[in-house]
Amino acid sequence: MSNAFIKVENLSFSYESDSEAHTIPAVKDVSFEINEGEYIAVLGHNGSGKSTLAKLLNFILEPTSGKIFVDGKEITSEDIVDDDIYDLRRKIGMVFQNPDNQIVATIVEEDVAFGPENLGLHPSEIRQRVDEALKIVGMTEYIKHEPHRLSGGQKQRIAIAGVIAMRPRCIIFDESTAMLDPIGRREVISTMQKLNKEENLTVINITHYMDEAAMADRIIVLNGGSLIIDGTPEEVFSNQDKLTEIGLDVPQSVALANKLKAAGIKLEGKTLTPDSCAEAIYKALIARGTQS
């Protein structure tokens, strides 16, 4: 047994179709490990199986076959009981695409307190958790506000605070920025990074945005329910032709860097973001200037 926080072995899942004789495969024989504190992006186009995988990891869906281990315990075992599932969901929280579907109260602090209250915690402990969670997501000043009056990004941060208040060790973001405008996306992405770097939470970001995936420690690429690439952003985006074949692009900065490298211009360092790419190009130009 490995020391991975999440371990998936030969995981498969099929949805039932209209015909009882047929099923629709969504995840096919997928295996990987995630260590505690990692920042993982799961990348794929629509229908690739990434959201289904997210629901399997939180046991919202039960796999057709294969095994899932969380913190060393097999949650797909026949011996699993309801208390084990509740414990799993305290360890692994989820933030969904539409924050309106996750917000349950009419006042921000009451919404964030909903989960801890259902754990039967003492009011003082609930108060502490609510205050800490809102501080982490930068929404303390909105504690008495009505969630429906907030922007999309602010609502999503309230939804995240509600998950944080449960004290999970991992949060799965299931396309949590897909419905947000650019400002809201930046707010939520910044929150993901803060949770990972400052709070040491394991973050799994299910996304189809290349720039979001580029921020992860590791990227898992799904296509047609199968895992086709698993590596660092640099390793994954170096497979530009393979990504193009399955309908995915690479970040613009990476595409530019790849063209320059193909033209014989040597770039040093990372080129995953516009700033890092610009710095690499600048250094390459300086180097070429000193050689001429």
Describe the role of every protein-language-model region.
Residues 43-45:
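The feature captures the beta-strand-to-loop junction immediately N-terminal to the Walker
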Residues 58:
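Helix-to-loop junction immediately C-terminal to a conserved catalytic motif
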Residues 66-77, 88:
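Conserved ABC transporter NBD signature motif
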Residues 124-142:
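Conserved ABC ATPase "signature" region
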Residues 146-150, 154:
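Conserved ABC ATPase signature
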Residues 171-174:
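Catalytic Walker B motif of ABC-type/P-loop ATPase nucleotide-binding domains
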